[in-house]
UniProtKB/Swiss-Prot annotation:
<dbReference type="GO" id="GO:0003723">
    <property type="term" value="F:RNA binding"/>
</dbReference>
<feature type="domain" description="KH; atypical">
    <location>
        <begin position="24"/>
        <end position="86"/>
    </location>
</feature>
<dbReference type="InterPro" id="IPR036612">
    <property type="entry name" value="KH_dom_type_1_sf"/>
</dbReference>
<keyword id="KW-0694">RNA-binding</keyword>
<dbReference type="GO" id="GO:0005737">
    <property type="term" value="C:cytoplasm"/>
</dbReference>
<dbReference type="InterPro" id="IPR031952">
    <property type="entry name" value="MOEP19_KH-like"/>
</dbReference>
<dbReference type="Pfam" id="PF16005">
    <property type="entry name" value="MOEP19"/>
</dbReference>
<keyword id="KW-0217">Developmental protein</keyword>
<keyword id="KW-0963">Cytoplasm</keyword>
<protein>
    <recommendedName>
        <fullName>Developmental pluripotency-associated protein 5B/5C</fullName>
    </recommendedName>
</protein>
<comment type="function">
    <text>Involved in the maintenance of embryonic stem (ES) cell pluripotency. Dispensable for self-renewal of pluripotent ES cells and establishment of germ cells. Associates with specific target mRNAs.</text>
</comment>
<comment type="similarity">
    <text>Belongs to the KHDC1 family.</text>
</comment>
């Protein structure tokens, strides 16, 4: 069992203290992806916590890739589901970035199709 030191003071009411604050699910994500997941300045984080009934803590890692470590606390099945949800959202972000043509490519092929009629 992994015991971590929870630094958050605003523990959500659905998290049972102390039993839900041990053995967190942990994964790493780039800070840019984290902004996609939680919004600017983490504006959507509390909503995602409430919907998933989990609690998240973020820890900056000193790395050139600007990685953030995400700790997920809560009941075991809730932690696993919340981790899966966040990792799925991160994967979707990466897939969208790969499919999205760069602006350079966009303008190399003539920019927007001006022959389309407005509806």
């Amino acid at each position: 069992m992994m015991v971590t030191l929870v630094t958050r003071k605003d523990i959500p009411p659905w998290v049972k203290v102390p039993e839900d604050l041990t053995d967190p699910e942990v994964f790493q994500v780039q800070s840019l992806v984290l902004k996609y997941l939680f919004g600017p300045q983490g504006s959507r984080m509390s909503h995602i916590e409430q919907v998933s009934q989990a609690m998240f803590e973020l820890k900056n890692l000193e790395s050139p890739e600007e990685l953030i470590e995400v700790f997920i606390y809560g009941y075991q099945s809730i932690k696993v589901r919340a981790k899966w949800l966040l990792q799925s959202m991160a994967e979707r972000y990466h897939l969208r970035q790969q499919k999205r043509p760069s602006l350079t490519t966009f303008w190399e092929f003539g920019g927007p199709d001006v022959s389309l009629k407005e509806c």
